[in-house]
Amino acid sequence: MKKNNGGRGSKTDAPAVTRVRTPRRENNEILATVSALLGGKRVTLQCMDGIVRMGRIPGSKKKRMWVREGDIVIITPWDFQDSKAEVIWKYTRPQVEWLERKGFLK
């Protein structure tokens, strides 16, 4: 008999990847890896364009999106300061595997 887990899906069942959000170049979005947590809402990011940026997690996403070191995220660099960026999306493990298979991650 299956254990009652409060109406939530089991953590062991990985959902099948149906569609993965990819970075949109027209919106100036870039893939990045979280290299360090700085505290508060700030992280250090190693971006796919070779630049190390300081990222900020917006307050609307802070509680919903728990970011750890090594996570793959989508960022948008600031218009007026290229060394800083906003974190707008975090990928799950199956989505990261899909990105690696399709060649988005190097």
UniProtKB/Swiss-Prot annotation:
Gene3D superfamilies: Nucleic acid-binding proteins. SUPFAM superfamilies: Nucleic acid-binding proteins (SSF50249). Residues 18-92 form the S1-like domain. Keywords: Initiation factor, Protein biosynthesis. InterPro entries: NA-bd_OB-fold, RNA-binding_domain_S1_IF1, TIF_eIF-1A, TIF_eIF-1A_CS. The keyword Protein biosynthesis applies. NCBIfam families: eIF-1A, PRK04012.1-3, PRK04012.1-5. This is Translation initiation factor 1A. It comes from Methanococcoides burtonii (strain DSM 6242 / NBRC 107633 / OCM 468 / ACE-M). The lineage of its organism: Archaea, Methanobacteriati, Methanobacteriota, Stenosarchaea group, Methanomicrobia. The gene is eif1a.
